Every structure is written in C-alpha cells, then in structure tokens.
Amino acid sequence: MLVCIGFTASTTFMLFMNCNQELGKLYGMANPSMIQSFYSAGIICAVLLTAALMKKGLKPIRVLVIYPCVAFCALLLMYFVQIPQICMIGGFLIGYFAAGGVLQLATSTANEMFPRDKGKITAVVMIASSIANYAVLNVASLLSKVGGVEGPRYILLFNAVVTAIGIVFAIILNLRFEKDAQ
C-alpha cells in the first residue's frame, strides 16, 4: 500500500506542477506563473504547520488520508470552477496538501512499519515515485494532445482519479494499522 501511495502522492503534485500554467491560461489568467508562487507558499506552510501538528500528536498515517482528500477536493474545485482566482487558490491547496510532505510521510511511515528494512522500503517507495514521474507525464501529454484546448482540464480529472485511488490505499492502510495496533 505504501508503495502505491508513493506513486499516487507523487502524481498529485507533479501533474499539477507541470500543467498548472496551461490551466491558468485556459481560465484566462493574465499571469499564470503566479500559480507557482501560491503553490510554493502552500509547500512552505505545509512543512511548518504539519511539523507543528505532528508535535501535538497528529499521526503521519492519518495525514496520508486527510491531505490527499483535501487535494482531491481542490482538483475537483479547479475542474468545476473555471475562473482565474481558483487557479491560485488551488495552487496553494495542492502545494500544501499534495506537495507539502505526503511522499515523505509515506516513506517515514514505511520505515516505521518495516524498521529492519528501512533502506529497502525507502528505495521501493521512491522507485514508485520515479515511475510516476515518467508514466503520468506521458499520460498527461497524451491527454493534452487528445483534449486540445480542454487538455488541462482532462489532466485535472486524471489527477483527481489517481489521487482518489491513493486515498483508497491510505484508508486501507489506516484500517490495517488500527487493526494491528489493537
């Protein structure tokens, strides 16, 4: 499950990072590069606030469900609300809830679950992330070609589907974790 989350977590932020400017243009933004600034601000906030929440007792395994759920909602919001401002709001939300440490928390959770094989499990999760970098960008390229002007919106939907799959994996993982804890 954690390996699959490595794939889906990477997909969520990477697809957005690579396609947000085209989405901004489609939605009529005068300066679509602003999306990247909001995305980066989201990442910085996520790192700081998530660390504080962890110190207060939030479990990383819970973040693996909560953060992708918010990212999923942000992707759908950007799909349905086609105005320039939503790109900046969505950029911040994806930066925070997708790029702000979900992959790293998946890796640390894997290390916690497999303490004797930390190196191996880290490598496998990161290999899944690397495969996502290659595979989903190729799919996004195809969607962009097939979708024409609407290509960025098709990519949002594809991203939402992959993120939803990651949420299912995270829920299953949480249920197993709870069962093992009892």
Feature map (PLM): residue ranges:
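Extracytoplasmic gate region of multi-pass secondary transporters
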Residues: 1-44, 107
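Hydrophobic core of transmembrane alpha-helices in multi-pass small-molecule transporters
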Residues: 7, 86-101
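Residue-level signature of mid-helix packing/kink "hotspots" within the transmembrane helices
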Residues: 40-48, 130-134
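Helix-to-loop junctions at the C-terminal end of transmembrane segments
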Residues: 46-59, 144
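Structural signature of the two symmetry-related core transmembrane helices
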Residues: 62-77
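Intracellular juxtamembrane helix-capping segments at the cytosolic ends
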Residues: 100-114
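A late C-terminal transmembrane helix in Major Facilitator Superfamily
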Residues: 111-148
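Symmetry-related core transmembrane helices of the 12-TM Major Facilitator Superfamily/SLC fold
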Residues: 154-174
